[in-house]
Amino acid sequence: GSRFSERVTGDRNRYVGKKTIIQLDIDPSEVDKNVMTALPLVGDMKENLTKLSERVQKLEIEHWWHTIRAWDATENRSAQSGDRLTAPWLMKELTRSFKGEDTVFVTDVGQNQMWAALHLEVDAPRHHLTSGGCGTMGFGVPAALGAKISRPEAQVVQICGDGGFKMTGMEMYTALRESAPFITVVINNSCLGMVRQWQQVFYDKRYSSTILTPFNFVGFAKACGADGATVTTCAEFTAALAKARKQGKNFLIEA
């Protein structure tokens, strides 16, 4: 089902290397389109995976998990950088603040989605809503609205970038109208971060249509009947999050 796009593989030559690639897809036109495979299996995923698993030996991967946990511990330490607000720290703070609670996290699309996937810890199934690799910028706000209407007893926290919020942010008014409050965290880097990153890595920093003009996110939220705060430090973020939880209404934090 993977298209082996550059957002999945990065540098395809380095990604492929000496690997033996088996591609499973329902669509034959996707086979060998981006990466040459040793064994293409076209058809129903469940049927093909069942047959494939019968021929694959079970691997002992405990040592690999130890390596991953060591990386995670290193990343956790690097995320602590005084009072300077970083995306990894922000995700860890959200995890800490809502630990053990019935909280549904919703991510938009872009670097915010990647940071959440790496550093946000979710305790239960169906408590992390994401559009995966579909690239649906603007998914966050309406998805959070739907989650809150579906499960009004749960706390809903929506994480997005400045680009994604600008696409569907007006739904905050719908949330007001429907009495469906949730917390929105906008990670604002004043650009379409993931596209800009690819322009930097693959296109010799030839930036095009990725730098965004300033926008008053908190003012916009207040115009939609919500409250909000702009934060630049860890302490400010923690205080704003506590205020958002106490108020129990739509609240936007621009970080």
Pin down the residues of each PLM region:
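Glycine-rich, acidic loop regions that bind phosphate or pyrophosphate groups
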Residues: 1-67
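Active-site glycine- and acidic-residue-rich loops that bind
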Residues: 3-5, 84-88, 164-167
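Thiamine diphosphate
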Residues: 13-15, 31-42, 46-52, 114-255
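Short, well-ordered loop/turn elements at secondary-structure boundaries
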Residues: 17-18, 99-101, 247-248
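Generic enzyme active-site microenvironment
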Residues: 23, 106, 159-160
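Active-site diphosphate/adenylate-binding microenvironment
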Residues: 68-153
